[in-house]
Amino acid sequence: VLRQNGIKTRYYGLDKNQNLTHSNAELAKEAVCGLFENRQIPNDLTLLACGTSTPDQLLPSHASMVHGELANYPMEIFSSAGVCLTSLQALKICYSNILAGLHQKAVCVASELTSPALVSKFYDPEYEATHDNPDKDPYMAFEKDFMRFMLFVYIWIN
């Protein structure tokens, strides 16, 4: 399965004890800072558009939290939320605002932090039930492990 899904590297927001190492906002901040020399955000950047389907909390918005993590100058912020296309929504906001002449410089970032839902304690009961009872169908335990390791583990940052 690993060979066929094409995933070569996995990144987790967890340490070896399954404690969070970063918030989603911190992951986005790291991605934005990585764009600039010396990791310094230019003060003429006037728009920050952030996309995620896994914000750290509902309020304030993900873009507000990322802006706070950046400890940057005042700027317009925009959050998009959803599933697959949040990064494109954020990119379109930057593109449209620059095209309309409302902003000269903008940054778009998309981040996901699914690691908190992937800690083993959420999957152990199913595994233990099938491991301790050889007559029980192990299909559900396999499905959960498959979803955990094959589909949800890749955390991407644009």
For every predicted segment, state its role.
Residues 4, 51, 109:
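Short acidic/histidine-centered micro-motifs embedded in hydrophobic/aromatic stretches
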Residues 16-28, 54, 58, 82, ...:
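Generic, well-ordered alpha-helical segments
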